[in-house]
Amino acid sequence: MVRAAFAFALCLLAFHAYALAKDPGKVELTQNWALSSAKDLQADGATISQSSYQEKGWHPIHRMPATVLEILQEDGVYPDLYVGKNMLEKVPQDLFRQDWWYRTEFTAPAGFSNYSLEFPGINYRAEIWINGQKVADNKQIVGMYVAHQLDVTKWIHPGSSNVLAVKVTPEQLIQDVDGVELADSWFDWLNWKYLGYQGKFTKTPQFGASYVPDRNAGIWKPVYLRATGPVAVENPVVNTDLSMPQATARLTVYANLHNFLEKPVSGTLKGTISRFGKQTIDLEQGVTLSPGETREVAFAPDQFQTLIVKNPDLWWPYTMGDPSLYDLRLEFVADQKSSDQAHIRFGIRSVTQHRDQDQEFQDKGKGGNFYLQVNGRDFLVRGADYTPDMLFKYDPDREAAILKYVKDLGLNMLRSESKISSEHLAELADEQGIPLVFGWMCCNQWEKWDQWNEEDHRVAPESVRSQILMLRGHASSFIWANGSDGLPPLPIRTEYRKVISELHWQNAVVDTVSSFAKDDKGERVWDGIIMEGPYSWRPPSYWFAGKYVTTRGSSAEQGDNEHIPTLESLKKFIPADKLWPINDTWYLHAGAIADANTLGSVQRAVDHRYGPSDNVEEFVLKAQLAHYENTRAQFEDYAASGWANHKMTMYWMLNSHWPSFYGNIIDYYLSPGGSYYGAKKGLRPMSVVFDAYATGDHSQARIIVFNQTPSDVQGLHVRVRVYDLSGKVIDDHSVEGVQVTFNGANQVLRLPRYPQASSVFFVRCQLFDNMGKQLVDNVYWQSQKDDDVGGPQNDDALNLKQDKWADMTALNTMPKVELEVNAEQTVVYGDRVNIIRLHNPSSHIAFFERASICSTRDGNEILPVEYDDNYVTVFPGETVEIHGAVSIKTDPKWVKLEGFNTPATAVRIE
């Protein structure tokens, strides 16, 4: 990659069109790009890729990578496509029916013998031209998930200007209509009634085909130029064979060496493994490469004893320990000159997959529930499904903010169903200790195997190869899924697994994450993971009842597909004249499945339980209540069930791909609402929970303490109080000396029914450690009337059906309370931390109080933001503190407070 650091530094002075990548000699081409529709141009690639060509009428690209529609929007061709119906009404829906040219000029560094271009992601086909020469055609450059590396040495102009032109052909085919191309799909994440295929041909897709107007065409991952000597060092990885509890690691280092020359090259591959405070490991071996040869070279512990490491600093998921990382540096030296270098960060850890002995799901196939062990310890998974932006906008700061939210919530795994963006997310996850799951998208191209042609059968394993090579070295990469809802046919999954094995993938592999898959003989097959939802709102008692298959085992996805964001967020994408009543502008931003596409389930849940709303403000507030109690109960039940009954869940979904009502915990604008704080409460490492009278004859409610920390705990104190709506305490219980093993749960109390209480009453559960410090204050609102979804046969995964409904409408008549509020600010670890105090001087309860930190009295909340708690309840005579942290770059001046039975107020931060 680079011969000498000094020479490379000199090149930096002249090289104006790139940003320095993490490896010497590898530079990211980020600047001087422009875009044009091919139909608007007469010139061909040979002309466009010359420095004399004039870019008249081209659209400047503000930051690469970028897809076509993102570029056009950024250049003002279209208004904000995420507002109202703009995506449907303000942009031609057939942008994908034309080719698009990307063009850039850059100066290549001088002093190197070989140059390569790397394209990790082009969607879908492309011609590559440089300096008037075609480097590759659109039969070679095919596949959204295929990475391409092109030797451009003979066409590059070292030390002077070069022109790169890429002609992109978008995905053209429509599944179930005229075939497939192995790009990506938004499936029901977009409402295909509005966005996508509208039945203009004689055939119609089985479900529907949703897509944005350009079908996410373009260069959607970074483009790199690599400058090297005669031999390149590629795709390094370090694998770990870990013995526990002795804590001895046998490391194996792999890397590919490629000889660009037409003659043999002999040299030395040198390596170092280092970590601050640990002894550095030095490696070295001689290598001779044949002309044009690419060879995998390994440093194995049997030959290199220093690769047997005792008591290493292990990489752990952040919920289990520290995510310790080591550095590997490799260098190939020939003729006493550095030909190329490579650097990666890796973790010493083991990830193994297992099946338990549970026979509850024999109808799904053979074997028990899937689970993971990390470094020999059981890993309790509490995850969520992640999505990038709908236009695949490249935004590292946004990714960092989302991962910060993940840790604030207490989630410990993210799943990507295709949509595998750049390595930046994995690099952050390595550092933060957040495990990741990757695999192919359900239902459309990747699972329409009977519609694949010869090209698809070539592109599929090439795509697997490209993604595994990118992901395999990351400590955060835990699971690869060859299929989602379906099971690839035997020849295809055999090919996938062959590639995965060849590339030394040292993590878990599953062929499906569904419990409905069948093999080639028509027999049910599963990998121990269920995928049965629900995908719509459920009452708290549903999760604790113990009679629904969805609440046990290991689940790949389950959550609420109809999520109402905060009012501030809603107003950002729904125009003022479309805010109320709910209408088709809302539906455009919903999912596609029937009932969800009109937000039917969430409206039923809110209206039946909290009463019909007269305006959008009332509806949104009630929806936050519903989201809070549902999401909290979902995570609390998993914890209260203990390791034996529930080993893995993924919430559907973590975040939003655009401003949407499709399921999420964090909305598109990164505003945390009711679902967020319900999830955060349910994901506490230790907590005390109330099961909503869900079991038996419903005459008693269980109070359960769970422990999801890495250690056993003892000496806990539980206090449970019951309040009526007026604020009067009608029952008070305490339990001392509670102990719980890690990943365990203990029932500590049973509460009777309280017929003497109001029609809705509050159950307050507090947990204290052995020093009397409060760990949790968990407040529930419970109706005298129970929710009842009915028997398992009535449980429709995709929409809400209930035989009986709780009546929460008495909450609307709670006595009004005025809180005394003040706020002050300090700086902690580079964040502005605002301490907000809510004091209740009255004899009544102040319910569901949400604080928002703002720059101005009437401004929107500063985002992203991290509160230790929100939507809090303040009991009579008590004071609650909320700590809210925002970036040091922001200017917080005000706190706004809104509650269910308190007037909205704003106070200045002192």
Task: Identify the role of each PLM range.
Residues 20-118, 198-222, 226-231, 356-358, ...:
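Extended carbohydrate-recognition surfaces in non-catalytic/accessory domains of CAZymes
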Residues 255-262, 582-870, 874-884, 893-894:
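Carbohydrate-binding surfaces of carbohydrate-active enzymes
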